[in-house]
């Protein structure tokens, strides 16, 4: 058993603007005092299959950690929407919270995130709809996803638990564990029902009345936004995409709660005072968060 056990994690709001900051409240039980503390990093992951374009939203160190129950918060910045291409903006993505002890990853918390726009079904804005890939390409993507899953499984051989959802009831072991990739695929396969329920209803109406109705609704929804943008210098926030007028400040995201949680076995060894290396006076201190 590790030194730290996650009891619960909460996000301040599961539905918000993509440009709004986030706050996570975490509760742990610490079985042995951790003097050197642990580090947490919050990442906005644009592609569940790659971390190449991840954005770091927060990076903190919590130290020291006393034995017993502890609780702390992580304040994370909003992702920079200007660094996200529009054809990769909408649909399913993820926010990750990674915990490390002396560089060793011991916990990985993944929130599946659905990014959409008010009044427009996400499927109308997603990259797959724009490119209309052939069946052969779709089959190839499914094979690639399976290959990625197998690779992740082999790399994470030391994983203690492939998926543990928020530990609210320790006796409830009926649900089958899922990997983060499986959770994303489940949401995608059921969605195409998107997490925005209102969007799903509008998508059904679209099949009856045609896409022109969406354009009309979208123009009405964004009329004041568009007029305001034309009369100001903030035109960069309003763009035309897939036949719709998109205001980047109005883009929404919804976090699926509870998150998918992966635990990893690591070596929890505290250095003795004689083995500790003194900090160089010229080194800038790491950002720490006090635990009360």
Swiss-Prot record:
Localization per Swiss-Prot or TrEMBL: Nucleus
Key words of the record: Chaperone, Chromatin regulator, Nucleus, Transcription, Transcription regulation
Residues covered by region (Disordered): 123-239, 267-292
Entry-linked InterPro entries: ASF1-like, ASF1-like_sf, Hist_deposition_Asf1
GO biological process, one term: nucleosome disassembly
One GO term describing the cellular component: chromatin
Function: Histone chaperone that facilitates histone deposition and histone exchange and removal during nucleosome assembly and disassembly.
Protein name: Histone chaperone ASF1
Organism: Encephalitozoon cuniculi (strain GB-M1) (Microsporidian parasite)
